[in-house]
């Protein structure tokens, strides 16, 4: 393998699925002689690659502003080349090429590996590389599929990523084995629609089989499941969660709403009654499970009665974790083309604020119940006077963290410790290690 003097800085925007793509590209680049950095505050590389997000308006604006920032850097001679990849360029390529000519190459969601070939010329034969993990090495995201077949009325993701495509199971398991060999202990399994895994291959859901096999791999300490869908939920997955101690009692399942009016208009293909039954059964079959969900307010046609149903459901379900947002139109979606955005912005915000106040009280009560319990905690980092860690119930970056005073004892990053929880807030938990 020849060496290259070129250095590349990859700026990864958006979700964890985008991050996996960035890490895959970095591994490929490094295998072919490039030095790579990731999301540095002051990129020093001759080449910058921006991996964009195009999901919602705020994400689009962030992506465009980032591209323009580096286009200016190129104009000023601070970088040599600028490339763009990801969801935004997948969807708006023609417009972007016209408006930002400073970009040397545009790549979408699936053809970004072509970038290396374009850099090196037609005669260059790329060496395959392993992902370059940019998170702390003890945890990683495992993307098991691309795309989505659900076509919810508000969602632009299928317009960007296309139909659901499951990765081969053995390919996923090989990746897990490799990452274990590199020191990874925690695996956060992600997909646009986790529970659909395998349906595109043979018409059957294989998520339970995949997670069962993943849990059997020696060295896998934690598996956490993200982005399940309520329709046709695979009940055998709950059996697998009970079977293995290294599968976290945690499930991220986006529900969006509860009223039948909203669920129908959103094209969610699930009913209010089915949703209540789903939550009740999950909690019944996996005791102590922590559920994370996402809810939406202000969708076209949402009445006060619809919103009141959502509040009542939230109080009943007592989700341990919740993200919520106000509806905004996304170009090309069913709702943008067929519904009037008729809920006033101030009403959307009022409803969002009320929903989050309700959830805040629930979250505080749930975390307070953990005080005086002993939890297994993995240490992510040290910040000032505290080690920062997480329990099995906490996903990286989005959930509460455990703060342990550095005066308690010396702790190793990436290791597990038994921690006595001494206090809690909505977003922070405090504890001391059990010596």
Regions found by a protein language model. Give the residues of each.
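Proteins enriched for Cys/Gly/acidic motifs involved in redox and nucleic-acid/cofactor modification
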Residues: 1-197, 251, 273-280, 284, ...
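Short, glycine/charged-enriched secondary-structure capping and boundary segments
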Residues: 24-26, 62-65, 97-100, 120-125, ...
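Glycine-centered loop/turn positions within well-structured domains
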Residues: 113, 150, 195, 260-261, ...
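Terminal RNA-binding accessory module
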Residues: 337-435
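Conserved SAM/AdoMet-binding glycine-rich loop
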Residues: 80-86, 91-92, 96, 181-305, ...
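Extended hydrophobic-aromatic, low-complexity segments
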Residues: 249-250, 263-264, 285-290, 305-307, ...
């Amino acid at each position: 393998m020849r060496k290259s003097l070129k250095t590349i800085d990859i700026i990864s925007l958006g979700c964890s699925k985008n991050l996996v793509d960035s890490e895959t590209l970095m591994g490929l680049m490094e295998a072919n002689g490039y030095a790579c950095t990731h999301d540095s505050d002051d990129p020093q590389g001759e080449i910058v690659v921006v991996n964009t997000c195009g999901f919602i308006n705020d994400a689009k604006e962030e992506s465009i502003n980032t591209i323009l920032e580096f286009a200016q850097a190129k104009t000023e001679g601070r970088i040599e080349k600028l490339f763009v990849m990801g969801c935004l360029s997948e969807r708006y390529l023609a417009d972007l090429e016209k408006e930002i000519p400073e970009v040397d190459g545009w790549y979408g969601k699936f053809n970004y590996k072509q970038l290396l070939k374009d850099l090196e010329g037609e005669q260059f034969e790329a060496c395959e590389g392993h992902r370059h993990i940019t998170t702390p090495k003890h945890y990683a995201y495992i993307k098991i599929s691309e795309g989505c077949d659900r076509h919810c009325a508000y969602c632009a993701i299928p317009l960007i990523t296309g139909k659901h495509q499951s990765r081969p199971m053995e390919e996923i398991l090989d990746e897990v084995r490799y990452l274990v060999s590199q020191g990874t202990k925690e695996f956060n399994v992600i997909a646009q629609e986790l529970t659909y895994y395998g349906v595109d291959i043979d018409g059957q859901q294989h998520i339970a089989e995949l997670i069962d096999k993943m849990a059997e791999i020696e060295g896998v300490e934690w598996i956490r499941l993200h982005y399940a869908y309520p329709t046709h939920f695979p009940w055998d997955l709950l059996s697998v969660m009970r079977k293995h101690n290294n599968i976290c009692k945690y499930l991220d399942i986006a529900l969006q709403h509860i009223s039948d009016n909203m669920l129908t208009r959103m094209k969610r293909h699930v009913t209010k009654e089915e949703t209540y039954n789903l939550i009740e059964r999950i909690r019944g079959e996996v005791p102590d499970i922590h559920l994370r969900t996402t809810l939406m307010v202000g969708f076209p046609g949402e009445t006060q009665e619809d919103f009141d149903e959502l509040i009542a459901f939230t109080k009943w379900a007592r989700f341990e974790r919740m993200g919520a947002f106000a509806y905004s139109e996304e170009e090309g979606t069913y709702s943008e083309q067929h519904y009037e955005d008729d809920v006033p912005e101030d009403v959307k915000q009022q409803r969002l604020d009320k929903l989050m106040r309700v959830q805040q009280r629930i979250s505080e009560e749930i975390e307070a119940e953990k005080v005086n319990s002993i939890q297994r905690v993995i240490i992510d980092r040290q910040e000032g006077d505290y080690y920062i860690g997480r329990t099995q119930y906490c996903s990286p970056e989005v959930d509460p963290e455990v703060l342990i005073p550095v005066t308690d004892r010396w702790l190793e990053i990436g290791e597990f410790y038994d921690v006595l929880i001494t206090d809690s807030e909505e977003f922070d938990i405090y504890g001391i290690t059990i010596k």
